């Protein structure tokens, strides 16, 4: 197998860990990070380009003749970075924009689970603050209130306090036009990552 030049898109600890692993691989000749961080500068070549400038990311990958692009953050994936790279025949580890919407939109994810019969908590979309009391009656506390945006882990409130729940609902409806109210499911939480290609996983 020929050695690869790899571009890691992102600037967080996740991307730093990926860059370390790639730098240690005998199959990788060079690692580039965009934009990277202070830590990645010791093991890779950082490129001061915004990861939200998708065309600039693609242009850099072409210029460097990158063998593989690994995308960490969700936002550029939702915006279609993997699609743009594949359009240029540049291999990319990351879902297309449609697949990334499972992470990018909580409502889309709930609708997909509902359509496919995948068990998930009961939910309701709330668009009018006049229905807040109906929600309090329909869902038992603690109430799970979610924004339908990528919010860096800040888009969810779980509370048994009616004033706190009302405040979150009112402010997020004002921002986004609606919120998602979800049944609270108690228990352990686990994340499972599955890597797959056209032939399986």
List each model region and its residues.
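General beta-strand structural signal in soluble alpha/beta enzymes
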Residues: 8, 33-34, 70-71, 92-95, ...
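Short acidic-hydrophobic, aromatic-tinged amphipathic segments that line or gate anion-handling sites
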Residues: 46-52, 124-128, 159
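Short, hinge-like loop/turn segments at secondary-structure boundaries
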Residues: 47-51, 87-89, 110-112, 139-140, ...
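A conserved helix-loop-beta module that forms one wall/lid of the active-site cleft
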Residues: 95-155
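Conserved ATP-binding module of the ATP-grasp superfamily
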Residues: 68, 119-121, 142-145, 158-191, ...
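ATP-binding N-terminal substructure of ATP-dependent carboxylate-amine bond-forming enzymes
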Residues: 1-98
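Short acidic loop-to-helix transition motifs that present clustered carboxylates
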Residues: 53, 126-131, 164, 186-188
